[in-house]
């Protein structure tokens, strides 16, 4: 253990698309943080920044189901920003994302992931049809949240 510690790899030189699918979890976290900043600076819910993600639910599902716990939490945070700022445009991703979110995040050992997962579910309800949307067909919202809070 002689010499200085190895330098952290700089992932900012890679494109966001490359970082989102990178094998290193730190690269994926970097992409998620970049996307949160991008989504926060959009001027409308029809901004072109959302287009690559609206029609790519497979990528969004991979973000929610990230194998690294830290990256998963940042990924769910990224999707909260995505749904919040893309608005009703993002509502069409709900049907693909929520089952994975419930399976992978609601029971997470990380409190931050659980909190963000609930926030994401609530964001979907808020943006879809003015809050009158169905979260999971056939299941009442109180039934979904009972195991988490009670």
Residue ranges of model-derived segments:
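N-terminal "cap/leader" segments of large eukaryotic alpha-helical scaffolds
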Residues: 1-43
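Core helices of alpha-solenoid repeat scaffolds
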Residues: 7-16, 46-61, 90-102, 129-140
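Generic alpha-helical secondary structure signal
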Residues: 11, 30-33, 74, 96, ...
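Hydrophobic residues within the alpha-helices of tandem HEAT/HEAT-like
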Residues: 20, 34-40, 64, 75-86, ...
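N-terminal helical submodule of small eukaryotic multi-pass membrane proteins
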Residues: 49-64, 68-81
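Short, flexible active-site-proximal loops enriched in glycine and acidic residues
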Residues: 68-72, 88-94
């Amino acid at each position: 253990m002689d010499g200085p510690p190895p330098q952290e790899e700089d992932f900012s030189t890679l494109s966001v698309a490359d970082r989102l699918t990178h094998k290193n979890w730190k690269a994926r976290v970097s992409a998620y943080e970049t996307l949160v900043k991008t989504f926060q600076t959009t001027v409308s819910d029809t901004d072109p920044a959302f287009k690559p993600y609206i029609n790519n639910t497979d990528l969004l599902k991979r973000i929610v189901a990230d194998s690294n716990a830290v990256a998963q939490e940042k990924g769910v945070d990224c999707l909260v920003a995505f749904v919040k700022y893309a608005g009703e445009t993002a509502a069409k991703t709900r049907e693909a994302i929520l089952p994975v979110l419930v399976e992978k995040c609601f029971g997470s050992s990380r409190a931050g992931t659980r909190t963000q997962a609930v926030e994401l579910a609530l964001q979907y309800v808020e943006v879809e049809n003015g809050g009158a949307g169905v979260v999971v067909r056939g299941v009442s919202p109180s039934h979904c949240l009972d195991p988490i809070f009670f």
